[in-house]
Swiss-Prot record:
Region (Docks into pockets in the proteasome alpha-ring): 598-599
Residue numbers binding ATP: 286-291
Subunit structure comment from the entry: Homohexamer. Assembles into a hexameric ring structure that caps the 20S proteasome core. Strongly interacts with the prokaryotic ubiquitin-like protein Pup through a hydrophobic interface; the interacting region of ARC lies in its N-terminal coiled-coil domain. There is one Pup binding site per ARC hexamer ring. Upon ATP-binding, the C-terminus of ARC interacts with the alpha-rings of the proteasome core, possibly by binding to the intersubunit pockets.
Function: ATPase which is responsible for recognizing, binding, unfolding and translocation of pupylated proteins into the bacterial 20S proteasome core particle. May be essential for opening the gate of the 20S proteasome via an interaction with its C-terminus, thereby allowing substrate entry and access to the site of proteolysis. Thus, the C-termini of the proteasomal ATPase may function like a 'key in a lock' to induce gate opening and therefore regulate proteolysis.
Annotated region described as Disordered, given as residue ranges: 1-22
Annotated protein name in UniProt: Proteasome-associated ATPase
GO MF entries: ATP binding; ATP hydrolysis activity
């Protein structure tokens, strides 16, 4: 052992130093690896942290937005609450204010004060600076505060008493203009009132109805008189002379009386001929009296518009349509007042050079013979009122009175004399030729006709219509037992048989055609065969005659005869002669014999 290798000790020391260096390196390597792992872990965790931060930032931003929106809503709510508080405060202040009074403005003065009428007194008050005194007009309402200061201008009064204007007084009012008028109020009480500003610019005539505040003493506006305004036919009737059948002679007479003086006024002046003042249309009911009056209004309106160069579509007729019973009033003098208003309105329109027609329908109801009244004597004052209007001291120029009546014998003779109702036109019941003309107005070739009837006339609608009219008229006017209607006994013992043709009228013919058309419609619905046929017209005649059997009752058959158009000897007895009326159904015919059953 002592002889070991030399240098062995130094080798061991070298190995030890090499081993420690190796351990340090290993430790350093491990440390570095740990550092690398830490760095790698941090590098891996860094995006996750960034995302977390971004998420927190987004949440914070969203919360800020929510808080901002909430803050905005709170601001709006506070602003609205503040506005409501201010409104409530204003409402409380307004409710706490004392009440305001109203007055009527009368006049203004240079010192800025004004006169008003309030609480039944005339007072001079001051005006608020916010009110322009120059804008206030006479009669205007003004609002006053508790100190009686004018704080606001208002409108004109719209309610009050209706008074009639008697006359306008030509003296200066507070504003230096015509401002006073004499009016008549309730119970003919007269008073002088101021005219408000709206009335100063409008023409006023005696008789106008004015709205009056009797306490303030002002008239504010003109009130339309419905009782007269409603009488004017602003819309022209659509009835022409061509639409009237069977009355060509009567139409010519009334055109000569009404239209000729207007169309050829120069010739009338040259021949010193005054146009007639009135026309009486009389005759049985349903024969066209009112129809002619409508045609006169239509024709006259077109003639006036043509003379003025206006479009006929804009034509207006000055046609005062007066229904007789409509004028009657239980108060004494009211009917006469209405008549005066009617003719006053007619004179106003006629003064413009336009012809005016005053049409009295059922004239016998109000202008009957004086002294003939049983329960009243209203005609003793109504008739003189009409007479004085037609040819009194105040003449009627360009005004024509047309009366219609089926009892002309009851009209006062003073009205019917020449110079008043000059022209008297009898509207008679249509004869056979007149009936054909009337049928032609209702049966036209554009109506659907039955195939059998068309075939009979070779398919010509015009010839078919003409044949149907011919057959119908022959059936109505033939003197057969089927057409016998009544046997009348006169006071002298004579008897006369009256046929249905003696009671025919234009209204009856129209009714027959309407019945036939309705039967044609029912036949179409039942049998599917369209068209109007002669058979429908024949059945319509039978039905119409059957209805005329049962006439209203009267105790005086002579009165019925006068209305129906039969004049002459007094009738004392009437008996029906209706036989064979509805042979198809075998209906029994009742023959009534009690006197006066038929009116």
């Amino acid at each position: 052992m002592p002889h070991g290798h030399p240098g062995s000790q130094p080798d061991e020391g070298g190995e030890l130093s090499n081993g420690s260096s190796s351990g340090e390196l290993t430790a350093q390597i491990r440390f570095l690896e740990d550092e690398i792992a830490l760095l790698r872990r941090k590098l891996t965790e860094s995006p996750r942290h960034a995302r977390l931060l971004e998420q927190r930032l987004a949440e914070a931003t969203e919360r800020v937005n929510q808080l901002t929106e909430r803050n905005t809503k709170l601001i709006d709510t506070l602003r609205e609450a503040r506005g409501q508080l201010l409104a409530l405060r204003e409402e409380v202040d307004r409710l706490a204010q004392p009440p305001s009074g109203y007055g009527v403005f009368l006049a203004r003065f240079e010192d800025g004060t004004v006169d008003v009428f309030t609480s039944g007194r005339r007072m001079r008050v001051s005006v608020s600076p916010s009110v322009e005194t120059s804008s206030l007009v006479m009669g205007q309402s003004v609002r006053l505060n508790e100190a009686l200061t004018v704080v606001e201008g208002g409108d004109f009064e719209r309610t009050g008493e209706v008074c009639a204007l008697r006359e306008v007084l030509d003296d200066g009012g507070p504003e230096g203009s015509v401002a006073r008028a004499l009016v008549v109020g309730h119970a003919d009480e007269e008073r002088v009132v101021w005219l408000a500003q709206p009335l100063l610019d409008s023409p006023l005539k005696a008789g106008d109805s004015l709205l009056v505040d009797s306490k303030a003493g002002f008239a504010y506006e003109r009130v339309p008189k419905a009782e007269v305004e409603d009488l004017v036919l602003e819309e022209v009737p659509d009835v022409r002379y061509e639409d009237i059948g069977g009355l060509s002679r009567q139409i010519e007479q009334i055109r000569d009386a009404v239209e000729l003086p207007f169309l050829h006024a120069d010739l009338f002046r040259e021949y010193k001929l005054r146009p007639p003042k009135g026309v009486l249309l009389y005759g049985p009911p349903g024969c066209g009296k009112t129809l002619i009056a409508k045609a006169v209004a239509n024709s006259l309106a077109k003639q006036v518009s043509k003379a003025r160069g206006e479009d006929h579509k804009d034509a207006k007729s000055f046609f005062l349509n007066i229904k007789g019973p409509e004028l009657l009033n239980k108060f004494v003098g009211e009917t006469e007042r209405h008549i005066r208003l009617i003719f006053q309105r007619a004179r106003e329109k006629a003064s413009e050079g336009t012809p005016v027609i005053v049409f009295f329908d059922e004239m016998d109801s109000i202008f009957r013979t004086r002294g003939s009244g049983v329960s009243s004597d209203v005609e003793t004052t109504i008739v003189p009122q009409l007479l004085s209007e037609i040819d009194g001291v105040e003449g009627l120029e360009n005004v024509i009175v047309i009366g219609a009546s089926n009892r002309e014998d009851m009209i006062d003779p003073a009205i019917l004399r020449p110079g008043r109702l000059d022209v008297k036109i009898k509207i008679e019941r249509p004869d056979a030729e007149g009936a054909k003309d009337i049928f032609a107005k209702y049966l036209t070739d554009d109506l659907p006709l039955h195939a059998d009837d068309l075939t009979e006339f070779g398919g010509d609608p015009a010839a078919c219509i003409q044949g149907m009219v011919q057959h119908t008229v022959e059936r109505m006017y033939e003197e057969t037992d089927e057409n016998r209607f009544l046997e009348v006994t006169y006071a002298n013992g004579d008897k006369e048989v009256l046929y249905f043709r003696d009671f025919n009228s234009g209204a009856m013919i129209q009714n027959i055609v309407d019945r036939a058309k309705k039967s044609a419609i029912k036949s179409l619905l039942d049998t599917k065969q369209p068209g109007l046929s002669v058979r429908h017209l024949m059945d319509a005649i039978v039905d119409e005659f059957a209805e005329n059997e049962d006439l209203p009752n009267t105790t005086n058959p002579d009165d019925w005869a006068r209305i129906s158009g039969k004049k002459g000897e007094r009738i004392v007895y009437i008996r029906t002669l209706v036989t064979g009326k509805n042979q198809e159904t075998g209906r029994a015919i009742d023959t009534a014999t009690n006197t006066g059953q038929y009116l």
